[in-house]
Structures are given as structure tokens and as C-alpha cells.
Amino acid sequence: MSNLNGVLLIDKPKEFTSFDVIAVVRRLTGQKKLGHTGTLDPNATGVLPVLLGTATKTQDLILNHDKSYTAEFQLGKITDTLDIWGTVTGECESSVTEEQLRRVIPNFTGEIEQIPPMYSAVQKNGQRLYDLARQ
């Protein structure tokens, strides 16, 4: 049994769940006490801090810090999952200009309350929304 204490910053690859990453770290290190600081959707990539040993006690401190996200988007397509991985259910020509985008971007900066889409890792009654959506 390993007795490591600290934080590993893992660049979570696409198609791995946060739990998958924890399982790999557990298998590679033999560490029993592990945690992470917030679930990333399986199709999301990015830094996933993995806490080992006594560092798991700092989880709340890390979770309560500001986070930032970078997003890419495509205008003119609608999918059944509201993301790029779904089946395209509609298309339209986009007449939005770069200037129009630059004017509205400030509306998406700062603290924003968002209703998560059904295809997300958010849990309801102990189940991931993306699992419920696929049923």
C-alpha cells in the first residue's frame, strides 16, 4: 500500500471520466485515499487536480476557488445533445459577424448561473444526467 500525500495535476483526456482518472492513479500508485476537485464531463479536457492522502482534506479549499474555462463553438448547427458530439438535427446559415460576437462576449464573463444540459456530468438522484438522457 502506498502512502502518498499531495496533489497531482492531471491533464484529463477526452472520453475519460474523472472517476476513470482516479482509477488509473489508484492502480499506478497503489494509493487508497484519493479524491478530485470537481467532475469534468467525459468529453471535456483539462486540468483535474487529484488529491492523495492527507491532501484530500484540502478539497473544499480548492473547490471554492475561481475557475476559468476556454470554449470553442460552432454557429449554425443544432444537435440532439446540445454539443458537438450529438447528431445534427438542424442547420442554418449564420450571419453573425465577428464584431457582433465581440460585443456580446462580455455578457459571458464573470459569475454566470447556468442550467446544465441533460448531456452533462451533473448528478440528479445519484445518476449522471448524461446517463439519464441516454435511457
Located regions from the model:
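Catalytic/RNA-binding core of pseudouridine synthases
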Residues: 1-135
